């Protein structure tokens, strides 16, 4: 049994069940359980039994256990709160907004964040897994490797950052995923995204109701998918941006009720810019007391670019999607991903469970006769 596919299928089976239980659609839930049972049995009875057991546990856990929202419980902690107070005392106005956005994921009353939301590129301007992975990889590569000091330092920085951003799900994803990779290097596949999602749901059982959680994991699924495709290196950013737009557009529509026709181009344009300002914000932080509000000058090009982008873009007004649309849309995407994964990434699995199945072999013999 392929663990990567198994965790993905468990997650794919659980998510509709979670929302059906929330809506108290128990008849639809029963039909869904029958469907995933039949599909699992077609694959393997052990797979079916294990999948149903885990999915049933997660649905019961989310239904009976009171809602735990870890990102709200620990948002004001002993690291984040003093840091915010220091920024508020040292800066004001737009400089205060921009520093909070790039350093600690604070989006309240932030003009740049609102512009990014309208442009459908909001995932680039919050502290994402990409930023933290970049930070950990930087420390792992360049710090002293003896006694695993580089990895220990990397985890220490990730943990501090986790408190700084108030346990945002995108940061929690990187921390758990990186920890799993380092501790269970041989036992788990390298991209343990589905397992990480299930563990976060165990920590915060209503994580699926959080848009940050959904944006982070959906975008990451797309990036992992594209990285394994045999494409020209120059084409990968374009393909990634296009697929991310396709995958997260229902969430963007739900928040904004319109789509940016130039989203793909703006994703390509703003991706390196967002990473640049993430790094620059930390570099200028020690000098804020010296230069004061003049430090905002470094953010002026970004502000002007975001405002210009709003003026030149074309918006498509589309009705806000409902729950049924989400089920159908992401159900089809999940099914296509599963089929493509089996057929493209693992030919042995495809051959073992389909091409070499008794039914197919018997049809081949009849055809040859």
Swiss-Prot record:
Annotated S-S bridges: none
Main location per the UniProt record: membrane
Any one cellular-component term (Gene Ontology): plasma membrane
Membrane topology qualifier: Multi-pass membrane protein
Keywords: Cell membrane, Membrane, Transmembrane, Transmembrane helix
Parts of the chain that traverse the membrane: 25-45, 47-67, 119-139, 152-172, 206-226, 235-255, 272-292, 296-316, 323-343
Organism domain of life: Bacteria
UniProt-annotated location(s): Cell membrane
Family, per entry: To B.subtilis ComEC.
Protein name: Uncharacterized protein MG316
Species whose genome carries this gene: Mycoplasma genitalium (strain ATCC 33530 / DSM 19775 / NCTC 10195 / G37)
């Amino acid at each position: 049994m392929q663990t990567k596919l198994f965790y993905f299928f468990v997650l794919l089976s659980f998510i509709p069940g979670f929302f059906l239980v929330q809506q108290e659609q128990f008849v639809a839930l029963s039909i869904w359980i029958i469907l995933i049972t039949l599909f699992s049995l077609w694959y393997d009875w052990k797979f079916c039994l294990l999948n149903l057991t885990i999915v049933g546990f997660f649905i019961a856990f989310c239904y009976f256990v009171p809602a735990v929202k870890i990102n709200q419980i620990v948002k004001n902690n002993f690291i984040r709160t003093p840091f915010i107070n220091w920024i508020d005392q040292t800066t004001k106005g737009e400089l205060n907004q921009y520093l909070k956005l790039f350093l600690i994921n604070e989006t309240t009353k932030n003009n740049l964040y609102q512009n990014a939301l309208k442009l459908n590129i909001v995932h680039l301007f919050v502290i994402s897994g990409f930023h933290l992975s970049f930070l950990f990889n930087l420390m792992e590569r360049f710090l002293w490797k003896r006694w695993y000091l580089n990895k220990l330092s990397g985890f220490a920085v990730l943990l501090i950052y986790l408190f700084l951003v108030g346990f945002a799900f995108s940061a929690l994803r990187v921390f758990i995923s990186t920890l799993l990779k380092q501790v269970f290097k041989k036992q788990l596949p390298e991209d343990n995204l589905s397992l990480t999602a299930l563990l976060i749901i165990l920590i915060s059982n209503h994580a699926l109701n959080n848009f940050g959680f959904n944006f982070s994991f959906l975008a990451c699924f797309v990036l992992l998918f594209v990285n394994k495709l045999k494409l020209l290196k120059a084409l990968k950013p374009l393909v990634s941006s296009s697929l991310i737009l396709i995958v997260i557009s229902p969430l963007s529509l739900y928040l904004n009720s319109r789509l940016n026709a130039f989203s793909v181009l703006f994703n390509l344009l703003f991706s390196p810019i967002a990473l640049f300002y993430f790094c620059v914000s930390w570099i200028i932080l020690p000098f804020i007391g010296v230069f004061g509000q003049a430090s905002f000058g470094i953010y002026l090009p970004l502000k002007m670019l975001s405002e210009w982008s709003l003026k030149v873009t074309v918006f498509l007004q589309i009705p806000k999607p409902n729950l049924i649309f989400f089920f159908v849309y992401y159900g089809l995407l999940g099914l296509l991903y599963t089929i493509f994964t089996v057929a493209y990434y693992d030919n042995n699995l495809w051959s073992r469970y389909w091409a070499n199945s008794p039914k197919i072999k018997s049809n081949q013999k009849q055809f040859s006769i």
